[in-house]
């Protein structure tokens, strides 16, 4: 895979660092408008010169730096010397420190070199763009699939919640109906008890009436035995005698008065 980086030296001269990397080898080429510097090395880096021992400077990190991937603690710096060029790897935390570098040998610049670099750069950009688009498409498909999965889970949970609420409403209605039926049954039992009580009261009242009637009948029979029928039959005449007696007295008095008048 080919990668292109834009670098500047201390004088501000512009360079293009072209890196061709595979599993076991690397080709580095720094090109300016006037010169060209080249380095061929193997991976692991045998021609890398280290200033200090750093465990963090691994082969993977060096490849990432040459490919242009951002790394917050390490940077690349190009310095042009006599007949060579150095690509320094700086450790910037807490202050810039050159921990390793590559030395590229100067070579003659060919007339068609710039065109080849531009052509390779355009194709590299195209390949990177296509690879990036393919990666984004793959990520988008995964995201769409994950979104559909979430939608299905949401629908399933929604259905479960609806069924749960429906069961709760159904149970509540059943409980309400059971309470109403229990209340109605209780009222019916109360009515039945009231009717039975009324019937019992009616029976008791009829028994009392019968008892009273029998008592009156017994009393009447006792009176009948004590007083003869003549007395009972004469009692109305006796009751009516005062009026008739009064009438007889008045009649007698008038007759007596009339007789006295005649005698005179």
Curated annotation (Swiss-Prot):
Disruption phenotype: Spores sensitive to ionizing radiation. One of its GO terms (biological process) is double-strand break repair via nonhomologous end joining. It comes from the Eukaryota. Residues 200-209 have a biased composition (Polar residues). GO terms for cellular component: chromatin; cytoplasm; cytosol; DNA ligase IV complex; nucleus. Residues 173-186, 248-264 have a biased composition (Basic and acidic residues). It is found in: Nucleus. The keyword Nucleus applies. Transmembrane segments: none annotated. Residues 173-264 are annotated as: Disordered. Keywords: Nucleus. Its main location: nucleus. Coiled coil: none annotated. Interacts with lig4; the interaction is direct. Involved in double-strand break repair via non-homologous end joining (NHEJ); the repair of a double-strand break in DNA in which the two broken ends are rejoined with little or no sequence complementarity. Belongs to the XRCC4-XLF family. XRCC4 subfamily. This is Non-homologous end-joining factor xrc4. It comes from Schizosaccharomyces pombe (strain 972 / ATCC 24843). The gene is xrc4.
């Amino acid at each position: 895979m080919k990668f292109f980086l834009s670098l500047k030296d201390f004088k501000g001269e512009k360079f293009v660092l072209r890196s061709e990397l595979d599993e076991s080898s690397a080709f580095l080429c720094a090109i300016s408008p006037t010169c060209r510097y080249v380095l061929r090395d193997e991976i692991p880096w045998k021609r890398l010169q280290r200033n200090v021992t750093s465990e963090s400077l691994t082969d993977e990190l060096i490849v990432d730096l040459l490919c242009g991937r951002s790394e917050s603690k390490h940077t690349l710096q190009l310095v042009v010397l006599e007949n060579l060029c150095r690509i320094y790897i700086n450790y910037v935390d807490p202050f810039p420190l050159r921990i390793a570098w590559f030395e590229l040998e100067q070579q003659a610049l060919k007339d068609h070199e710039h065109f080849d670099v531009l052509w390779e750069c355009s194709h590299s950009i195209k390949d990177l763009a296509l690879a990036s688009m393919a990666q984004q498409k793959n990520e988008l498909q995964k995201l769409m699939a994950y979104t559909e999965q979430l939608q299905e889970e949401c629908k399933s949970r929604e259905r479960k919640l609806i069924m749960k609420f429906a069961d709760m409403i159904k149970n509540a209605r059943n409980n309400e109906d059971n309470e109403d039926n229990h209340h109605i049954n209780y009222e019916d039992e109360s009515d039945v008890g009231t009717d039975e009580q009324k019937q019992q009261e009616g029976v008791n009242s009829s028994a009392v009436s019968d008892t009273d009637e029998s008592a009156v009948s017994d009393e009447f029979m006792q009176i009948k035995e004590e007083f003869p029928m003549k007395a009972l039959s004469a009692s109305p005449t006796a009751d009516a005698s005062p009026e008739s007696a009064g009438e007889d007295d008045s009649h007698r008095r008038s007759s007596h008065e009339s007789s006295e008048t005649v005698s005179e």
